[in-house]
């Protein structure tokens, strides 16, 4: 049934035509409109997404800028600026805007620790820092309400190691923060030990660490090994760290090796730990590290071995058995190492006659003799101390070996140096060598060592030293000449007063000696 109000097809066609639009044009227009609508919608969606992305990036940028401003404020030397930065940080933590994972990106933990330890700040600011550290770690402040600010800081940092052990960023920042406290005072070291930090460090060392984290850990362990003779903890608290040190010595990273060697050197000054170090063969591992041709940490390892030998003779035999002498023998004549190596050998010499026997049998002393003749003064000086220590044993075999080395000329040339200590040692060595020569007299009863020394000009040097202003050197030189170098050209006179003309004064003196005059009472 038709609609009377609806126009017919023809009429509609006329209407389209009157509007100059036919059916095809209308279809095209609708298609264009639809395309335009879809395009607009697509543009709107893109713009909306772009705005959302921009808003997110701006929000992140604003957060980063705010966090950066807080980090910069903590590095200020003005307490007002520091306090403002702490207030902003604490507020954002309360609002859970920032987490520990975000904060460690700018090393907030280390910066807070640096402010706490190295800035002149009020107790209020210290309290705020301790509360902030607890908040960052996610610890309830009420639980530690009665603790001191120092305890709160250390507790929160140790808590981070156990809680966030899988995050290298957090561990690195935490290790650096604890190191900051320990550098400030050994009291903080003992506080950390009371918080059972050693077990946490042992657990952290078992994970697969990056080089940066391993360096941070080894540096922290080294700080725990320093100054153990002051406010000493129990040895059982420190002994577990030796396993970390052992792994550090065998590391491929030079910085880790360096800190491990420094740790051993520091431990050598604390006798209670010697037994534990010996069980793990730490010094033997140091020697093995020194033997490694690819070790970039060789100078520090060498210095660590030197410090250990200086501090104690407990490990000398262990290191010699591990091949230390063979290693040093190869380094003695290396120009840039000879001084330090000769210094180590001179310290080894004082361990006793058996050690000197090993130095002789290994050929180390013969290499030292070459240093006496070829190297610059500082190396020759240390080599001379080696020879002096060998002579000081007074063992005939050692003295004979020194004479046979053929370096007495270079050795006695150092008598003209300005080092009073060295000259005194050399004079003592010459005296012992001349004593040895008296036991090996030639058929004409002459001292072969005295003859040899005189041939190389030693006697002239001794006569020169007799005029020294140093009483010690003067006495030593005069004693040697007086005993071993009698002047054969001087006329022998049994009576030193032969030809002396007596007079009346001599008679009076003799009479006074025979008959002493008794003092008479004084009277007016």
From Swiss-Prot:
Oligomeric and partner information: Forms a complex with an importin beta subunit.
GO molecular function: nuclear import signal receptor activity; nuclear localization sequence binding
Residue ranges occupied by any IBB domain in the UniProt entry: 1-59
Protein name, as recorded: Importin subunit alpha-1
Native source species: Caenorhabditis elegans
Residue span of region Disordered: 1-42
GO CC, alphabetical: cytoplasm; nuclear pore; nucleoplasm; nucleus
PROSITE patterns registered for this protein in UniProt: IBB
PANTHER family the UniProt entry points to: IMPORTIN ALPHA (PTHR23316)
Lineage per the UniProt record: Eukaryota, Metazoa, Ecdysozoa, Nematoda, Chromadorea
Alphabetized Pfam families for the sequence: Arm_3, IBB
Expressed in which tissues: Adult germline tissues.
Keyword entries, A-Z: Cytoplasm, Protein transport, Transport
SUPFAM superfamilies the record matches: ARM repeat
Domain comment (free text): Does not contain ARM repeats, but instead Ser charged repeats. May have specificity for cargos distinct from that of other importin alpha subunits.
GO biological process: NLS-bearing protein import into nucleus; protein import into nucleus
Subcellular location(s) per record: Cytoplasm
Domain of life from the UniProt record: Eukaryota
Disulfide bond annotation, renumbered to this chain: none
Function: Binds specifically and directly to substrates containing either a simple or bipartite NLS motif. Promotes docking of import substrates to the nuclear envelope. Seems to act as a cytosolic receptor for both simple and bipartite NLS motifs.
Family: Belongs to the importin alpha family.
